[in-house]
Amino acid sequence: VCHGTPLPKLWDKYLEYQKNNYHSEIEDISFRNKTYGYHSGTMRIQFKNGKTYYGSARVDPMLKSFFKEISSRPSCYQCYFKNLERCSDFTIYDCWHADQLVVGLADDDKGYTNLIVQSKKGEQVLEKIKQDFDIYPVDTERAIALDGIMVRNAAHPHPKREEYYQDMDRDEVAEHIEKFIPITKKDHLIEWSKKIIYRVGIYRFLKKKMS
């Protein structure tokens, strides 16, 4: 299930911004890295000079604009594939509430995935590979209600989206995004604290206590 696709131009500007910040070419990118757990997807960029950048949707300008629905292409707001009857063999999307869908299943913060089989071929493929996975039957409509709102619903455009793209070339990308979607000192403090408590080994423990 697709959340949306930002314009390639914005992505290219973001990559240049990161390369300039780290004075290095990029070796690898993970858009939703799980270093801090499944519920804390993070942008991770590994550079050829050995440095690594981590930034969650709280502080990373690209992720923040993506999840605030301001950076997607116009076609994303009128997506023709937003329905349950699809031409694919499978529909796959994040399962954030596995413990509410399957009795006795614990949320280990490593991640579960919702899977809807859409075709006969999909059934045949699943039959061949099911021994390699832990599979739990769930109610499709309940799973969609909990985690799959975008199975049927397209992204809603941010009210300032047109202005956002019209002015994109005037500023460096992080400054530009900051104008429309501010990243606060509180955001940076929370992000900094998260990295510290992760390094001392208590991050997941605290997340469980607060959930």
Regions inferred by a protein language model and the residue ranges of each:
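Long, charge-dense
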Residues: 1-12, 29-32
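Long, compositionally biased charged/polar accessory segments in the mid-to-C-terminal portions
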Residues: 24-211
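Short acidic, glycine/serine/threonine-rich loops at helix termini
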Residues: 9-14, 41-45
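A structural-propensity feature for long, helix-poor, extended segments
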Residues: 18-19
